[in-house]
Amino acid sequence: MTTSHILGFPRVGAKRELKFAQERYWRKELAEQDLLDLAKALREKNWKHQAAANADFVAVGDFTFYDHILDLQVATGAIPARFGFDSQNLTLDQYFQLARGNKDQFAIEMTKWFDTNYHYLVPEFQKSTAFKANPAHYVNQIREAKALGLNFKPVIVGPLTFLWLGKEKGEAFNRFDLLNQLVPVYVEILNALVAEGAEWIQIDEPALALDLPAEWVEAYKSVYAELSKVNAKLLLATYFGSVAEHAELLKALPVAGLHLDLVRAPEQLAAFEDYSKVLSAGVIEGRNIWRANLNKVLDVLEPLKAKLGERLWIAPSCSLLHTPFDLEVEVQLKEKNTALYSWLSFTLQKVEELNVLKQALNNGRASVQAALDASQAAADARATSKEIHRPEVAERLANLPKGADQRKSPFAERIVKQNAWLNLPLLPTTNIGSFPQTTEIRHARASFKKGELSLADYEAAMKKEIEYVVRRQEELDLDVLVHGEAERNDMVEYFGELLDGFAFTKFGWVQSYGSRCVKPPVIYGDVTRPEPMTVRWSQYAQSLTNRVMKGMLTGPVTILQWSFVRNDIPRSTVCKQIGVALSDEVLDLEAAGIKVIQIDEPAIREGLPLKRADWDAYLQWAGEAFRLSSMGVQDDTQIHTHMCYSEFNDILPAIAALDADVITIETSRSDMELLTAFADFKYPNDIGPGVYDIHSPRVPTAAEVEHLLRKALNVIPKERLWVNPDCGLKTRGWTETIDQLKVMVDVTKKLRAELA
C-alpha cells in the first residue's frame, strides 16, 4: 500500500483565529491560558483534517506561536544571549519578546524563508553559543496527538539547514564550527521524540537546494551518521528545488527515506530511480493554489509504484504553510467566477487530492473515476478558456518592436532635458510615495466597500486627504511631491483590482510572519489594463500645486512576486504582460502632464532563484519587464524606481541595467553601507539613499541625518544625489511624519548652502 503524509500545515487557522488571539494577548485582552487553549484546539483541528484525508501520519511539531525556526532556537538553547533569557524556562511572554523586541532589546532579525513570502527569525550564533536541548515544544505536541489516537510524524528542521540560516554575531568566527556541538543536542531532541513513541521523524534540509559550500555538503555524511543512531526511521525532506547534484551523497546517507520536490524540480526524479529506501514523491504543489491534473500526476506515480512498491510515499511538494486554508469558504468567488473557482485548490483541497492519488495507486484509477474526471475536466477547461487566453495579449508581446524596452536616448542626454524643465535645487528632496493611512481613511474605504458610503462621498474624502498631503509637503518645502496614496489599500492589490487577469479571494490568507498574514492576488489570465488606474488622482494632486507631482506605480516584478501566479505559462511571460499593461498607464500619466513617474520594485531581489546559475536568466527577464513598463516615454520624462533594504552588491549590473533615471533605496539602517557598492560600481544614474528609518516613530536628530547625508556625498556626486526617507510613510502617524521630514529638509538646506 502507498503511504501518504503531509510535510506541514498552516498554523493560523481557517479564519486567522491564531492571529487575532495573539494580538489580543499582546494587548493584554486575552489570558495566557486562553491563548494556549485556542492553539491546542487549532492543532487538533489541523490533525483531524489530515486524518480525515486518509494521511498515514499527521505532521506534529510544525505548529508554532510565531515561527518554527524560533522554536528551534529555543529547543537547541540558541536564543540570542543579549536578551538574558533562560531557554530551558522560557515564558510565553519572553518567547514573544524574542520575536517582537522589548524596551531593552530589538527583535531578532527577520528574512525570507528561501524564495517564499514567509519570513523566519534569523538565529544569532556566537563563538560562545552553548547549545542545550529542550524538546518540550515537540514532546508536548506529540502527547496531544497521541491522546487523540493519531499516528504521528514529528517534523523538525535539520541541523545543517538551521546553522546555514543563521548569522555570526560578535567576535569573528565561522558558524560551521558550531556543528559538532549542535549535533549531540539534536540527538538528544530526537531521542526524546523516540521516547514518546515516534517511529518516523521528518528532518527538513531545504538548504540542500542551495549552492552550499563543499564542506557543508560533505558534513551531511558525518551529521546523519550520528543522527541515524537514534532508534527511529528518519525521513530526510528536501524541497524548493532540485537536489540531483547531491544524488549519490543522499542515496548513501543512513536515513530510512528521502522526500523530493517533484513540482519545482520534476526532472530530478531520474537521478533517484535506483534509490533503495522509501522515496517520498512531492507531487501536489505546496506553495501555489492551482488544482492538480491528477491523471498527469498518476502517469508519473504509477511507474514509480511498479518499481518501488510500498517504498513509494506521496506528499505535497513542501509544507502547506504557503497556501490558504479552505477554498469552500470562497462563496463570492464561486458565484462571480465559477470557472476560476474550479481551477483552484487550497490546503484542505490539496490533502483531498493527495487522498485521491493514494486511492488510485492502491485500488486502481477506476476506484476514484469521478474525482479523476472532475480533475481532468477542470484542467481541460483551463487550457482552453477564453477568459485566460487572450490572443491580442500574446500578439502584442510577440510584435513588440526591437529595442522596445530601451529608452530613446542614454541617461547622460535624458538628464539634461529633464533638468531643463524640472529646475530643481541641488540635493532635491522627495518622498517615496505613501503618507499615513489614518483611521479616517481606513474607515472611509471600509464603508465604501460595504456600500455604506457612495462613490462620490468616498472620492470626496480621498480628495480631501490628498489636498491635506499636498499642503503639508508645500509647508515643509519639499521639492518633488507625491499625492500620498490615500486611495490605495495595498500597493499590489490596488493595481490587481484594476487590471484584467487578476482575481481576489476573501479568505485566501497566508502567514507572512508571526501574526501578519497576507492575501495575495491571483493572476489567472492574460494581463491587460482596461482603463487608466491612477491618472485622475495624480492629475488632481498636480492641479493643487505648482510644484512637480510624481506619479506612483507598482512595478511588474513586485506585482508578480507578491501574487499567486498562474502556472500554465512561464513567470517571465506573465511579468512582461504586466510590464506592457503598466506602460499604457505610464504613457497616459505622461500625456496628462505627470512627467516624473515612480515604478516601485521592492521585490526585485526576492525573485532571485535559489541557485546562482539561474540568476542571469531571471535578472534578464525581470529587467526587461521593468523597462517595458516605461516603453515609449519621452527623454524629458523622469522615471524613478524604489527598492527596499537589500544586498545589492552582487546584482548591481542588473540594477544599473534597469536604467531608471533615479533610484531611491533603503539605506539608513545600514549606515549608508550599501552606497559603497554603488560608488565602487560607478552607478551611472541619480540616486536617493534613505536618510532616516521610517520603521520607527522616532524622530532622527539633525546630526544623524547630516551624518548620513555627508557619508552619501562622499561616494555620490552632489549633482546626482537626491534626499528622501527610507520607504513610504503609510504606517507612521502624522505628528512624527511632519517632525521627521522637517529635520530632513532643514539638514538638506544647510548642506545645500554649504555646497553652493
UniProtKB/Swiss-Prot annotation:
Catalytic site: H695
InterPro entries linked to this entry: Cbl-indep_Met_Synth_N, Cobalamin-indep_Met_synthase, Met_Synth_C/arc, UROD/MetE-like_sf
Give the metabolic or biological pathway.
Amino-acid biosynthesis; L-methionine biosynthesis via de novo pathway; L-methionine from L-homocysteine (MetE route): step 1/1
Q: What class of enzyme is it?
A: transferase
**GO-annotated molecular function:** 5-methyltetrahydropteroyltriglutamate-homocysteine S-methyltransferase activity; zinc ion binding
Tell me the residue numbers annotated for binding L-methionine.
I432, G433, S434, E485, D600
Binding-site positions, Zn(2+): H642, C644, E666, C727
| Similarity section | Belongs to the vitamin-B12 independent methionine synthase family.
Name-wise, this protein is 5-methyltetrahydropteroyltriglutamate--homocysteine methyltransferase
Which organism's genome codes for this protein?
Haemophilus influenzae (strain PittEE)
